Design a protein with these regions (language model features):
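Substrate-binding pocket helix/loop in short-chain dehydrogenase/reductase
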Residues: 98-100, 104-109, 194, 205
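C-terminal substrate-recognition "lid" of short-chain dehydrogenase/reductases
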Residues: 120, 213-242, 247
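Active-site helix of classical SDR
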Residues: 123, 159, 167
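Alpha-helical segment proximal to the catalytic Tyr-Lys
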Residues: 128, 172-176, 233
């Protein structure tokens, strides 16, 4: 069965980086976009940047690591629109580079709560809603670090690997409801999060990347637009990794 044309989208982590660019690109395509972020002011700036575009952008605050916050967000959205056609979950944190023997419980739990629990909470609410109109698309952001070992980033890689398997399993569970679930595992993209990498690491990555550059946020947003389009109707449970050839 074909999915409905995407008209309403929720972007988590839409206040900056890839989430911001995706929000504006979808708004440019005429969609109604809810921009959600822990930093409400940043989400509001994204929404303001969408003024004058064919679509409509609205800002919301959310802490994806808290199930009650996510539930409150979806409750609010349900009062404002009849359906949710697209969830794009980009909200995430990087954390510090640390070896397992120096990794404390709080660091581990924080990484899991934002990067894995957050995806689960958002997917659970989205599926409950999408099932009512038997159509929808979910795009979960993992990372190239979920596809290859990244020493020093054990909790991050583990959480993002969990996102991939959650998405694959969910894709099979909800296919009968005409819901598609796909993952994007970006390589190193030119966003503010690059500043959080250890000194010298970006140069190391460039040397290892066959295309010798970082990704551009517009390239990632273009992939999301494709996955939201009728052209991607036969895609579900797949991991797409734009990474410049870093992992093949």
């Amino acid at each position: 069965m074909k999915t409905q044309v995407v008209q309403t989208a929720l972007i988590t982590g839409g206040g900056s980086g890839m989430g911001r660019t995706i929000s504006l690109q979808l708004c440019r395509a005429g969609m109604r976009v809810f921009v959600a972020d822990l930093d409400l002011a940043a989400a509001q700036k994204t929404a303001q940047a969408g003024h004058g575009l064919p679509g409509r952008a609205e800002a919301r605050g959310v802490d994806v690591s808290q199930s009650t916050s996510v539930a409150s967000l979806f409750s609010d959205l349900r009062q404002r629109t009849e359906r949710l056609d697209l969830l794009v979950h980009t909200a995430a944190i990087l954390g510090q580079t640390v070896s397992i023997e120096d990794l404390d419980d709080e660091q581990w739990r924080r990484m899991m709560s934002v990067n894995l629990d957050g995806a689960f909470y958002c997917c659970r609410q989205a599926v409950r809603w999408m099932k009512t109109h038997r159509s929808g698309r979910i795009v979960l952001f993992s990372s190239v670090a979920s596809l290859t070992p990244t020493p020093g980033a054990l909790p991050y890689s583990t959480a993002k690997g969990g996102v991939n398997m959650m998405g694959k399993t969910l894709a099979q569970e909800v296919a009968g409801y005409n819901i598609r679930v796909n993952m994007i595992a970006p390589g190193y993209v030119d966003t503010p999060m690059l500043a959080g990498l250890p000194e010298g690491f970006p140069d190391y990555i460039l040397k290892k990347t066959p295309l010798k550059r970082f990704g551009d946020v517009e390239e990632i947003a273009g992939l999301v637009s494709f996955l939201a389009s009728p052209a991607a109707d036969f895609f579900t449970g797949q991991i797409f990794s734009p990474n410049g050839g870093l992992v093949i």
